[in-house]
Amino acid sequence: MTQPVQTIDVLLAEHAELELALADPALHSNPAEARRVGRRFARLAPIVATHRKLTSARDDLETARELVASDESFAAEVAALEARVGELDAQLTDMLAPRDPHDADDIVLEVKSGEGGEESALFAADLARMYIRYAERHGWAVTVLDETTSDLGGYKDATLAIASKADTPDGVWSRMKFEGGVHRVQRVPVTESQGRVHTSAAGVLVYPEPEEVGQVQIDESDLRIDVFRSSGKGGQGVNTTDSAVRITHLPTGIVVTCQNERSQLQNKTRALQVLAARLQAMAEEQALADASADRASQIRTVDRSERIRTYNFPENRITDHRIGYKSHNLDQVLDGDLDALFDALSAADKQSRLRQS
């Protein structure tokens, strides 16, 4: 869901209010609110700076035009300032384009094996490692919240939390929100003795994580909470206490498991955060579906998402079917070199949002 175009005057006023709020020591007694205000301020700061540059350039241009009336030597300066004003005006227009309100958010990412049995589970593990390597390249923190492994060490399913360590307007969600869907792999499985290429698939789901669980309405009476013995790798070794937590949201049937934190309380807290992210995504996707049947097809669930990308090992090729992107550096992509692909997806998304505005 994108925000509508906002007028610059409204944003300038908001920026001034946020600046005052950040200077108030009382704000910092609430870390979550301070982080929200800080992120919003960081989002508006470049817009305000560009507006100030544009205003200054327009003033200089007006002065140069007055001078050129009596002195032709200022003609070149007028031309340069006209170009500068046009450039800054285009930048500001782009900054004011509709924007995903979750772009600064951290994420919860789930990887699930699909058709293809053991090979699919191994590919799901490859995808999880790819995202972990990408996060490491950007200095983000990755926590494995839950994992179910296959016989050969693949992932039947895994849940990761990926968090930025900085309050920036372009957070983890802004880069990784396009990963939800079905990912297909074409390669010779390790279980294939004849050397034949097989096709299998794995699913990825991505949710923006709310700043606080309280942002999403969750009724305690709607929850069933079970505790059991952890079976995951969990930090520095296998957790042998009954600290794993499974939360079932009865109205929707959503089940969230967390077992890799060190205590039952920590696992419950993380499971509630994941549940809040999934409920928030469900509510927003339903709103999109209600607003537009065309947008409903983009709902991020593995069962209903169409194939978004193919990883072809024999040809060392990756193809993103949504935008026709192709590259022959599959080995680098699986090592977390995803920025070129994500830049292309972001550019296509920006064009789409501009058309809708």
From Swiss-Prot:
UniProt cross-references to InterPro entries, sorted A to Z: PCRF, Pep_chain_release_fac_I, Pep_chain_release_fac_I_sf, Prokaryotic/Mito_RF, RF-1
UniProt modified residues of type N5-methylglutamine: 236
Residues with the N-acetylthreonine modification: 2
Superkingdom classification of source: Bacteria
Cellular location(s): Cytoplasm
SMART domains linked: PCRF
Similarity annotation: Belongs to the prokaryotic/mitochondrial release factor family.
Protein name (Swiss-Prot/TrEMBL): Peptide chain release factor 1
Native source organism of the sequence: Mycobacterium tuberculosis (strain ATCC 25618 / H37Rv)
